[in-house]
């Protein structure tokens, strides 16, 4: 059992939905992003997704691409991202952390080395957007052997033939991308997403979390209500990018979390 599994079990017992928040590590600098990260649990965040900045983020929309660029320009590296996690874990042993990004930085570091460092730092799961199930032997299976959850994305184009393959070695939760395309695009509508979430839930016992396009507490409530929770990324990253004070960012996160928890 990972911290992710424990969190969903607790939320189920409380009759609550999960609120997942995404931030980019090192955006706009290490100090600010760590301050935001430290404040997320108190703001109501159940699971933290920590973006690993990468030079070619093909699945990300402009908001998150720009955040990654700012982080890289500020000197953020995979080593510093792991240091961030260690600093957070020195104060918080409960909140699950999922690292999200691309395979290249992990491959460059060496899978075995990365997994040893990630587990030691206190990472609970990985989302690697450019590794399909056909390449599970590369990272997914070694990650699970190391005790990490490997979380997979399903999309509106994941048809019934493809879905079992996507779910095959997935653990922790399934991340349903409610809009086809890049992150932070048009808003998702609960009525459109509900049948797709039901289709995925019929094929797995794992929790299903809906993401992409959620910007308001009302949308968080609507979308969390048809799934096991929701994730907000671009709306939070946008505030950081605008240079808003950490307290203001966290107030906004708290409002979004309250929306999800009201579902």
UniProtKB/Swiss-Prot annotation:
> Might you report a single GO cellular component term?
cytosol
- Pathway the protein contributes to: Amino-acid biosynthesis; L-tryptophan biosynthesis; L-tryptophan from chorismate: step 5/5
Q: Which residues form the active site?
A: 49, 60
Recorded hits in CDD domains, A to Z, give:
Tryptophan_synthase_alpha (cd04724)
Instruction: Give the Enzyme Commission number.
Output: 4.2.1.20
A Pfam cross-reference name: Trp_syntA
Gene3D superfamilies in alphabetical order: Aldolase class I
Q: What UniProt keywords are attached to this protein's entry?
A: Amino-acid biosynthesis, Aromatic amino acid biosynthesis, Lyase, Tryptophan biosynthesis
Q: Which reaction does it catalyse?
A: (1S,2R)-1-C-(indol-3-yl)glycerol 3-phosphate + L-serine = D-glyceraldehyde 3-phosphate + L-tryptophan + H2O
GO MF, one term, reads: tryptophan synthase activity
Tell me the function of this protein.
The alpha subunit is responsible for the aldol cleavage of indoleglycerol phosphate to indole and glyceraldehyde 3-phosphate.
UniProt xrefs under HAMAP family: Trp_synth_alpha
Q: Which family does it belong to?
A: Belongs to the TrpA family.
Report what the protein is called: Tryptophan synthase alpha chain
Q: Which organism is it from?
A: Cereibacter sphaeroides (strain ATCC 17023 / DSM 158 / JCM 6121 / CCUG 31486 / LMG 2827 / NBRC 12203 / NCIMB 8253 / ATH 2.4.1.)
Q: Which gene encodes it?
A: trpA
């Amino acid at each position: 059992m990972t911290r992710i599994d424990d969190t969903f079990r607790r939320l189920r017992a409380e009759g609550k939905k999960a609120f997942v928040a995404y931030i980019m590590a090192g955006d706009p600098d290490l100090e600010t992003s760590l301050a935001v990260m430290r404040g997320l649990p108190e703001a109501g965040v159940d699971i933290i997704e920590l973006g690993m900045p990468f030079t070619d983020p093909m699945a990300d929309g402009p908001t998150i691409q720009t955040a990654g660029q700012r982080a890289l320009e500020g000197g953020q590296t995979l080593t510093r991202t792991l240091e961030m996690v260690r600093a957070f874990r020195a104060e918080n042993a409960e909140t699950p952390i999922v690292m999200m990004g691309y395979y290249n930085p992990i491959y460059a570091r060496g899978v075995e080395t990365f997994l040893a460092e990630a587990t030691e730092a206190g990472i609970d799961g990985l989302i690697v957007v450019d590794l399909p199930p056909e390449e599970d032997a590369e990272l997914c299976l070694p990650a699970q052997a190391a005790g990490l959850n490997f979380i997979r994305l399903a999309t509106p184009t994941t048809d019934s033939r493809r879905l079992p393959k996507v779910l095959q070695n997935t653990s922790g939760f399934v991340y349903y991308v409610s809009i086809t395309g890049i992150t932070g695009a048009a808003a998702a509508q609960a009525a459109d997403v509900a049948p797709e979430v039901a289709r995925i839930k019929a094929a797995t016992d794992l929790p299903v979390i809906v993401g992409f396009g959620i910007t308001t507490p009302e949308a968080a409530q609507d979308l969390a209500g048809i799934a096991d929770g929701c994730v907000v990324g671009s709306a939070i990253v946008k505030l950081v990018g605008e240079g808003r004070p950490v307290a203001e960012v966290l107030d906004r996160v708290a409002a979004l979390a309250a929306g999800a928890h009201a579902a």
